[in-house]
Design a protein with these regions (language model features):
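Beta-propeller domain segments
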Residues: 4, 23-181
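Asp-box/WD-like beta-propeller blade repeats and closely related beta-sheet repeat scaffolds
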Residues: 1-10
Length: 181
């Protein structure tokens, strides 16, 4: 597929490397546990997989893949095109991603969480075919915020410091389509 690379990087306060990965404009990878596309990944700073990642069950000779071929670096799945990743002052990890037609999302990332794409979205396919909303499938993690119309997010950060005290702790999202922060 073309596009939807995602691939944003951030180190958290504990030194773990977090990587977002887009679905490459294909529908199956985001739910395929034998692919690291459409996922949020977590690695140690040396590139190894943390032993407490949710899907770790490694073979010694293949440290990234377990007995049934699941990638151990996967932290969460069901992402379409995550283009911003940031840690808040409480240590929680957040991802902002472009949905399909409308349905851009701000997600609080949970260990082993499945965010549902392409099974659910608060947007529709570009050819206007509907995608079931998150509310129809409570087994998937719903976004904390979704945007209709889309904002086409490109970055996410949390305000720190004292220069903008009134905004301290708030998230700022850059919107390509909306041309706003």
């Amino acid at each position: 597929g073309y596009g939807h690379y995602g691939h944003r990087l951030v180190f958290d306060d504990e030194g773990y490397l977090w990587i977002t990965s887009g679905d490459r404009q294909k529908f199956t990878p985001a739910q395929d546990m034998q692919s690291n596309l459409g996922k949020v990944l977590r690695l140690n700073d040396d590139g190894s997989v943390p032993s407490d990642n949710p899907f770790v069950d490694h073979f010694a000779d293949s440290p990234l893949v377990d007995r049934i071929g699941v990638y151990g670096e996967v932290w969460s799945l069901g992402h379409r095109n995550p283009l911003g990743i940031a840690q808040d002052s409480q240590g929680s990890l957040w991802v902002i991603e472009m949905g399909p037609r409308h349905g851009d999302e701000l997600n609080l990332i949970r260990k082993g969480g499945n965010y549902g794409y392409p099974e659910v979205s608060d947007g529709d396919h570009y050819d206007r075919r509907p995608i079931p909303d998150h509310i129809t499938r409570p087994d998937f993690e719903a976004p904390k915020i979704s945007w209709v119309p889309a904002i086409s997010p490109s970055h996410l950060s949390f305000v720190e410091g004292t220069q903008f005290e009134a905004w301290r702790g708030n998230a700022l999202a850059a919107g390509l389509g909306a041309k706003v922060i």
